[in-house]
Amino acid sequence: MTGFSIAEMRRRRAAFGRELERGGVSCALVYGANRSGSAVSWLSGWPVTREALLIVAPEEDDDVLLVSYFNHVPQARRSCAVRVEWAGGRAVTTALDLLAARGRLPERIGVVGALPFDQYLLLAGQVSGVVNLNPGYTSLRLVKSAEEVAALRRGAALTDAAVTALAGALSPGTTDYQALSAAEYAYTAQGGLHHIHYLGITAMDEPAVSVPAQWPTGLVIRHRDVVTCEISAAAAPEYAGQVLRTFTVGAPPTALYAELHAVADAAYDAVAAALVPGTRASDLAAAAVAVIGQAGFTAIDDLVHGFGGGYLPPVIPAPGRRMATPDFILTAGMTVVVQPNVVTRDGRAGVQTGELLLVTERGPERLHTFPRGLQRVG
């Protein structure tokens, strides 16, 4: 269902098996719920619906995917290489019963994903050692395989199509519902999947929004508005592009917005120039903060984050936020989003610019084709 080859899925399973060994466990429970839980789809090929629990057994042929709703089981069986069974009333109870049926339960079991507390208690009540494998799993997602990069390129193309359609829909009288509908259709008509589409709308002359909103509210776009966006469409679960842009509606940017965007472009260029293997996250943070701070502005959104398989390291926070910059070194094959969200210090006006980039030995490679820069529409 995810479109990856058998060889790619086996590569992932072997890599995860090595993480089990490092964690001192022979098996693991990989959990996802409510369309979230990237490890389930990464290892099984099944996009999580209501709930899914993957039993990663000592031998790959013994892996079992437990799916919560009985009517979801048939498609899961058609889509996955692993055995699929109904999860029953409680997925962890079913998993422990299956493991016990093969002999006695192991003394230690690894866990990946946000396992609910009640199910954790069930597990901890029968297994003496419950091992958190989330950090190890995250490390497996940082450097992308050739097939993963290809999927991200496809996600980038779908995202470009969405932003192109969005830009065409931004005109006076259009609601944010209608604009986002146009963006969604552009990628769903090509088989793309939803990921995120955030939109910020405010008047350039009296700004009150500095970062895109996560939910549309029926806001009507007007002449001389400024629109910021953060759009991601996916080729497979967690394989999305990401484009952040700013548009002015029916008029050129005011002096303030022109300055904000010029600073954002300069910050983007400074960070992108440093995207080479061996660069530390602290160096990326310093490059962005120097440009933004010297201009007298700040930011709200994270400046940089890993992407493709989750919201990954390095997550570099906006200037002034009480969050330490991680001690992290870039490696070729990582994919990151550079996204300086430059805003005024009063938080009333802001711009977005940025996109998903591939770290290579030669420097950053663009995966997107949508033009950079502040654009006028409508």
What are the residue ranges of the model-derived segments?
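Active-site neighborhoods and metal-handling regions in enzymes and metal-associated proteins
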Residues: M1-G378
